[in-house]
């Protein structure tokens, strides 16, 4: 499985490198340290002929701002809805060389072992950033805990918000909080 992810990333990187093959300078790619920078560094290791400089992102650094300013040539960390949201926020348009894997998202609870034990009016913490909030809502829908407006069909291409919930049979309370706070909130939510 890990090899498949590296292979997929290699294909995606090859696509993005195709247009830069004539450039003399290294291709500078911004990436989160794990797993994206690890994948890029693995690719560099298996193909040393690639002139690739991996720029690892630190907390608070926006890779799209780096791309817009020319500090990097490409970035590798986001899915299409996040990219579209960033284009609006930055007033820029970026080219997509290839789409790649999306990090998994899960549902966790310290209080309940399965979805059927989730009580009426349970509080569910979700990330408050646009794209991960949408992914969380699609995940809740996949477990039949809510239903989104039918116009939201694909989490890879559309962004849903709590306003787009059309059915909520358990009357879940959706609590939007900062992503790093979610693990700390598990004792306070359902």
Residue spans for each PLM region:
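A conserved helix-loop-strand patch within extracytoplasmic ligand-binding domains
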Residues: 97-147
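Sec/Tat signal peptide C-region and signal peptidase I cleavage site
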Residues: 18-24
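Short beta-strand->loop
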Residues: 92-101, 173-175
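Short, polar/charged alpha-helical segment
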Residues: 30-53, 62, 66
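Short helices/loops that flank or line small-molecule/ion binding pockets
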Residues: 46, 61-75, 88, 137-139, ...
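N-terminal secretory signal peptides that target proteins for export/translocation
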Residues: 1-5
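Bacterial N-terminal signal peptides
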Residues: 7-18
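Short beta-strand-to-loop elements that line the ligand-binding cleft
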Residues: 51-59, 149-158, 171-178
């Amino acid at each position: 499985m890990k090899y498949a992810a590296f292979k997929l990333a290699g294909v995606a990187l090859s696509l993005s490198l195709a247009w830069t093959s004539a450039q003399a300078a290294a291709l500078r790619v911004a990436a989160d340290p794990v797993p994206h920078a690890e994948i890029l560094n693995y690719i560099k290791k298996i193909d040393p002929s690639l002139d690739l400089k991996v720029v690892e992102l630190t907390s608070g650094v926006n890779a799209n701002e780096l791309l817009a300013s020319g500090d990097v040539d490409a970035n590798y960390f986001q899915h299409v809805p996040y990219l579209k949201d960033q284009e609006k926020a930055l007033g820029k348009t970026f080219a997509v060389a290839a789409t790649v894997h999306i990090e998994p998202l899960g549902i966790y609870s310290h209080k309940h072992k399965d979805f059927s034990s989730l009580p009426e009016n349970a509080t569910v913490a979700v990330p408050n950033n646009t794209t991960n909030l949408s992914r969380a809502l699609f995940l809740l829908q996949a477990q039949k805990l809510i239903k989104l407006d039918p116009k939201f069909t694909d989490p890879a291409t559309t962004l849903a918000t709590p306003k787009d919930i059309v059915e909520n049979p358990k009357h879940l309370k959706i609590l939007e909080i900062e992503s790093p706070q979610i693990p700390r909130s598990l004792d306070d939510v359902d």
